[in-house]
Amino acid sequence: MEKNITPMMRQYLDIKKKYKDAIIFFRVGSFYEMFFDDAIEASKLLNLTLTKRENVPMCGVPYHTSKEYIRKLILFDKKVAICEQASNLTSTGPLEREVVEVITPGVIVDEDFLNDDVNNYLVAISDYKNYYSFSYIDLSTSSLGVMFYENSFFEKLKRDLEKYSPKEIIVSENFYYQYLHKLNLSRFLINRVPAWHLDKDIAIKTIKEHFNILGLSSLGFDEEKPYYISIFLIINHIKNNLKNLLSNIDKIDINNDSSYMFLDDVTQVNLELVKNNNDFSSQYSLYSVLNDCKTAMGKRLLREFILNPILNISEINTRLDHVEFFYKNISLTMTLREAFINIWDIERIISRIQMKRYIKKDFLFIEKALSVFFLVKKLFDKHNFDYWNFDKFEEDSVSKVYFLINSAISDSSDELIKRGYDLKLDNLKDLKINANKYIDEYLESERILSKINNLKIRKTNNRGLFFEVTKSNYSQVPSHFMESQTLSSSKRYKTEKLISLEVDINNAEDSVVAFEQEIFDEIAANVVKHNKVLKKVAEFFAYIDLVVNFGYLAKKNEYKRPVLTSDKEIFLDKSRHPVVEHYVKNAEIFTENFVRINKERHFCLITGPNMAGKSTYLRQVALITLMAHIGSFVPASKALIGITDKIFCRIGASDNLAKGESTFLVEMNETANILRNATEKSLIIMDEVGRGTSTNDGLAIAYSIIEYILEYIKARSLFATHFHELSAINHKAFINLSMKIEKQGNDLVFLREIEEKPSLNSYGIYVARIAGLPLKVIDRANAILESLLSRKGSSFLEFLPYISSDSNDKEALKNDTDVNVKLNEYLELKNFISNIDINNITPFQSIELLNQIVLKVISQSS
C-alpha cells in the first residue's frame, strides 16, 4: 500500500492526520471526495453509494450541492473539514490542497444551516485554579459573553447548559471527568482539551491580540482572577477551525447573575418555557404562545427574555410602559407589524459582512431594513413615543449606509453594481453589451476620415480584428494604419485604437466581473466601518418588535398590566394559564382562578382529585410571575406580584437510568436543591412530593418539607398533594386550597376552580373508572377503600410536633423536633399497641400494659 500510494492519496493522508476527528471533504475537481473510514461513515449517514478504488473505500458529493450534505452531517454532530485546491490546473505536479475551515455544530455562520429564532451557541467551561467560568458565543450574531461562578457553580452550570442549549462544548479533560460526566450530555458535541492547553499567560496574550488592547482590565477582567480562560478556549477554538472568522467579535458581555431571576435546569424543563417535554419542539411552550414577533431578531430576544427574567422594578416598568404604549395605540402597532415583515435578519447579515461571507442580497436586505428604520423614526415622532436612543451622528451614519447601498447595489438579477455608480464600470459594461456597435461606429469614423467608402473591419481567429483595404484604395490609406498582412487583392491593417478596442472587447466580460467584485468589496468594507451603529439598529429592531408583539398579544388575549412590588405577595384575580388557554381556546372556556399570597399567608396547600387542574394551577402561577418579570402583560384581570429572585418548580419526575437513579431519588435530589437554594423572595412550586415511596414515608417527608419551608425559608409556596392529612397543619402562614368538584349522581364534574378549603378525597377510583379499568377492579377497589377507611384510627398529625407560629419556638424546633425521630417513635408506639391481644389478657396484665403505654408517651414527650 505504501509503495503504490498516489501523490494525491499521500496528500489526503497527511491532512487526515491533522484532522483525525473530522470528516474530510477533499476537493477533487467539481466533487468533494471522502476516503477510508470517512467514506464508510458518510455513506451511511448521507445515504451515498460507497465504492472502492484500489481497495480504498470512497464516496463523493458534487461541489455545487455540498451544502446540504454538510448540513446533514452537522445535524449528526459531526465535524466537517473542507479541504480545497489551493493551486490552479496549469501548475505542475499534484495540486496543492489545504483545509480552509472546519465546520462544527457550534461555529456555524451559513444561514442555510441556522434556525432563525434560535441562537447557535458554542460554550466553553473553565475551572482553572478553581476560578469557574462559563463563556458562550453565537458566531452568527457576534454575541460573546461570560459568567463567573463564584458560588453554587454546579447548580449554575446545569442551569446555563439548559438555558443556552449549546450545539458544542469545550472543556478541559480534568473538568469533564470530575463534573460533566455526571450530567446527561449526549445531546452535545464535547471537545475535551488537555489540561496543559490551559495556560494563563498564553490566554492573556491571545485575548489581548484579538481585541488589540494593552490589558484585560479594559474588558472587565482582573488578570489575577483567570475567569477569562473560558474566553480563551473559545477564541482559540475558532481560530484553529475557521481561520480568520473572528473579525466580527469586538466585545465581551460580562453577565451579572444577581440582575436576573434564577431558573434552575429542572424549572426550565418543568415549566416548558421554550420547548415542550414531548418532542422538545417549541410548540405548547410559553415561547410559542408569546411569539408573534415579525423578525428573527425579535424572536431570539423573546427567548432570551423568557430565560432571563429581570429583577429591577424600574427596568421592568420601563418595558411595561413601552408595551402599554403599543397596547393603547393599536393602529400604530399594526402598521409597525406590517413594516417589520420587510426586515430580514440584519444582526446575522452584519456579522457575515464582517466575516467577508456576504452576497448581494445581504446588502439589499440591509437597505430594506434601514428604510423601515427611517419610517419607524417618523412614526415615533408623530405619536410622541420617546424610545429613540440614536444621536445625530448615529442617524447620519445609518443614512450614509442606506444611500451607499441604494446608489450602488443593483436589485436586478442581471448586474451587481448599478449603472451610474462608477464611470469606468459603466464603460466596461457598455463595451461588453455594445461591442459590435462600437466597432461599427469606429469603422464609420475611419471611412469618413480616409474617404474609402468600401473600408471594412473583419475578424479571423488567428489575426483578430483588422481593416481590409482593396488595391484601388491603397493610395488613400491613412498614415496611422499599420500594415499587418498583404493578400493578392487586398491588404490588412491595424490601428492602435482598433487593437485597444479589441483588447477591451475581449476582456470586457472578465473585467466587468472582476471590477464589479472589487467595487462590491469596497462597498462592504465601507459598510463594516459602520458596524457598531448597524448592530445597534439590529438591537433596536429586536426590542421594538418584541414590545410591539407584547402589546399586540395583550390586546388580542385580554392580558392586563401587572404591578411589580417589593413586597412578598402574589395577588392574581381571574388568572388563566397562558399556554393552556391558547391551545384550548377553540374547544372550551378556560376557568379563571384567584391567587392570594402575602407576607402573612404565603404557603398554599392544594388538595383535590387528579384531573381537577392542580398542576395547571401551579404552573399558571409560576408562568404569570415569570411573564411579569420579563415585561409582558399577563392573563389576569388584576396582578400584584412581588419581585421574585428565584422560581423553583418540582412537578413530576422520571427515572434517570443513565445515572442509575430511581424516580424517587430524582425527586429527592430536586427537592434538596430547592431547600438548599430558595430564599424568602423565591416562589416554590411543588407537586406531589413524597409519592414515590410508601405512604407513611411519603407523608412524613412531605410534612417535614412543609415545616422547613414555613419556619426557615418562608418563601411563597404552592404545594399540591394527595396527602389530605396535611391539611390539618395549623400555622398562621398556611392556606388550604382545593379544586372544586360537583357530584352528579355517580359522576363527578371537575370545575377546575380553586376554593379556600381542603379537599377530603382524591377520587382516584373514579378517575380509574373513567380511564376504562375493568368494572371488577373498580368494585374491588371500592370495597378495599371502605375497609381501609373503617380501620383508620387517630390522625397521623396528632403524633407530629406542633408547628408553632411563635418565633420564640424556632430555636427549640431546630434543636429538638427532628420529624423523622418523632415519626419512628409514633410507629413504635403504634406497633406496640397493635400487638396487644385484648381477648387473652388478665385485668392485671391490662393495667400493666396501660402503664407501659403511659411511660412510653411520657418518655417521648420529654
From Swiss-Prot:
It comes from the Bacteria. Gene3D superfamilies: 1.10.1420.10, DNA repair protein MutS, domain I, MutS, connector domain, P-loop containing nucleotide triphosphate hydrolases. PROSITE patterns: DNA_MISMATCH_REPAIR_2 (PS00486). One of its GO terms (biological process) is mismatch repair. It holds the Pfam family MutS_IV. The keyword Repeat does not apply. One of its GO terms (molecular function) is damaged DNA binding. Keywords: ATP-binding, DNA damage, DNA repair, DNA-binding, Nucleotide-binding. Transmembrane segments: none annotated. The keyword Transmembrane does not apply. ATP binds at residues 608-615. InterPro entries: DNA_mismatch_repair_MutS, DNA_mismatch_repair_MutS-lik_N, DNA_mismatch_repair_MutS/MSH, DNA_mismatch_repair_MutS_C, DNA_mismatch_repair_MutS_clamp, DNA_mismatch_repair_MutS_core, DNA_mismatch_repair_MutS_N, DNA_mismatch_repair_MutS_sf. Belongs to the DNA mismatch repair MutS family. This protein is involved in the repair of mismatches in DNA. It is possible that it carries out the mismatch recognition step. This protein has a weak ATPase activity. NCBIfam families: mutS1, PRK05399.1. This is DNA mismatch repair protein MutS.
